[in-house]
Amino acid sequence: MPDAFIETAYFKDLTNRALLYLQAGYAVHFCGPAGTGKTALAMHVAELLGRPVVTLQGNDEYKPSDLVGGNSGMRRKKLLDNYVHSVWKAEESMDSIWYDGRITHACRNGHTFVYDDFTRSRPETNNVLLSVLQEKTLDLSAIQKGETRLTVHPDFSVLFTSNPSEYAGVHVLQDALKDRVITIAIKGLDRESEVAIVAGRSGLPWREAARIVDIIRGIRGNDIKKPSIRAAIMVATILATKGSKPSSSNPLFYQILMDVIGSEISYENDGENNSLLIKRIEMELDKYTPENRK
């Protein structure tokens, strides 16, 4: 199955804007609902920069040391001197062993840092990024003895992704960090982008992928969150695996839609779940036929 990034006109515009901001020395933040391609876009932009990429997934349990690094164990050094045959001289010392965290490694070596879902980490943890983005230095004084401040490599770049703050497990982005990044809002994908992605990821012909996308978009309605493009990719991939067609007369297609979309959509009244979903799927199957969409 093809894994290359599928760049439509919509994503091309986002890519060019992100590259411009990064080249000007600013951090870029892609923010939008789940399933809109934020992570894939961030990785695509990072690869275009031509530098090694360091990735990190946001986590509520992270501490600053999980980003910056810390001391791990001790190194013992013992020197025995027997230069004078009748005299032994011994010197012994112990030092802590420092390891670079991912942000430190990227800052030190000029790599591109992709911090995915970074608002899932606590604001106090992400505060270590403030000096990196503003003064281009990384403060290590609270963690490491000796080297207390690291100057950020001039080739260092950073890309963030996040879901809106109303998502479960997402912290509100602190103002100090918000002021240091350029946020590009990613909303619902246009139809052309969705069809291109579904066809590319699943291997289905464009016409068949378009029908699946139209059905998913119709069920989605005005809600840009569910079902997401991931549901369309799942349905298309399963059909491609089976060698089956997205036809209203195909009972397997109908059941796949029920299973995949039903796992994403939930209703307050579980007793109405199946009947409401069946009606919505049947309505979209009747509306989008191979003859009236290309």
Predicted regions and their residues:
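AAA+ P-loop NTPase catalytic core and its hallmark functional loops
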Residues: 1-210, 294
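Alpha-helical lid/collar subdomain of P-loop NTPases
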Residues: 1-8, 24, 200-294
